[in-house]
Amino acid sequence: MARMICAVKRKYWVPSQSKPPKKTLCIIGDSHLGSVKRALDAGLVDLAGFDTELWGAQGPAFRQLNLIDGAYRAQSPQAVEAVLQINGQGRAHVAPGDFDIFLFYGARLRMAEFMPPMLHHMALPNGAISRAVLAAATERFVRGTRAARVAMHFAGAGARVYFAPTPLFTDGVIDFEKARWAVRDFPLAWAADAPQRAPLWQALADTFAAAGVGFVPQPEDTICRGVFTKANYAPEGALDARDVVHKSPEFAAVMMRAFLAGLN
C-alpha cells in the first residue's frame, strides 16, 4: 500500500495590525474655544492621537452651565442650543466618565483678575506675604470660579482633568494707562518678571493639584510687561474690536502644546 503523506499546515501567530484605540478628549470652555478650533482646523496643533470633542458655550450662555446630578449641563434652552452648536456631536451634557481626559480651557478663570493685584501687592515695600496667605488667597480665587469647581468635582469622581486658565490681557490693543480697565490700578505689577510670577503660577498649580486637577500655566514666553500677553497673539480684528481678552489660533496652539507636554 502506498504511503500517503499529508501536508500539515502550520499556524503561525501574526501580530495584530490594528492600532490601539484612541483616547477620548473633551475640551470644555467658553468663547476661547473658538481659537482652539481655529488652531485645530489650521493644523497648528496635532491631536491625531485623540478622539476630540469641544463642549461649552459662549457669552451669557456659559453662565447657564452648571453641575446638576453629577454632570455639567445647560440650564436653559438657549444654553442647550449654544452647547450643541459648539459640540457638533449632539452631546447636551458631559459627565466624569464620558471621556478619558478633560481639559477646561479659559472657562472664566481670568488671570488678568488674579495676577495684577497680587503682583502689585507683593512689590510694595511691606508687601511680602507668607506661603500660607498666598495659598489661601489662591484657593479663594480658584474656587470662586464655577468651572474650576466643576473640574475639581470631575477629578474627585475619578476623571483625569486639566485646567488652562483665561490668559492675561493682550498688549498693544488699547492704551491700558488710559482705558478703564482695573489692570491700570496695579502699576507695580507691570514691572514683574518671570521669577516674581513663578510663586503665583505655583500657588495655582498647588491649589488644583490638591483637588486632583492638573494646571496648565500660560507659558512665560508669551508674556510681556509683567502682566500682559504679547501683542503678536492678538486675534484678527482685535484692534477694531478693542478685544484684549481673546487670543489668536497661534496662542491656542501654544497652550495646547503645553497641555500635551504635561500629559507625558
What are these model-predicted stretches?
Residues 2-97:
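Basic, amphipathic N-terminal segments that precede the first structured/catalytic domain
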Residues 34-37, 61-64, 110-115, 169-175, ...:
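Short catalytic/ligand-binding loop motif for oxyanion handling, primarily in non-cytosolic enzymes
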Residues 165-167, 210-230:
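Acidic carboxylate-rich catalytic motifs and surrounding loops in phosphoryl-/glycosyl-chemistry enzymes
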Residues 118-148, 182-195:
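Surface-exposed cleft-lining segments at the edges of enzyme active sites
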Residues 87-138, 168-175:
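Oxyanion-hole/transition-state-stabilizing segment in secreted/luminal serine hydrolases
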Residues 38, 82-103, 146-158, 207:
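Short amphipathic alpha-helices and their capping/turn segments at secondary-structure boundaries
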Residues 173-218, 244:
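Substrate-gating cap/lid alpha-helix
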Residues 234-264:
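Histidine-centered active-site loop/cap adjacent to the catalytic His
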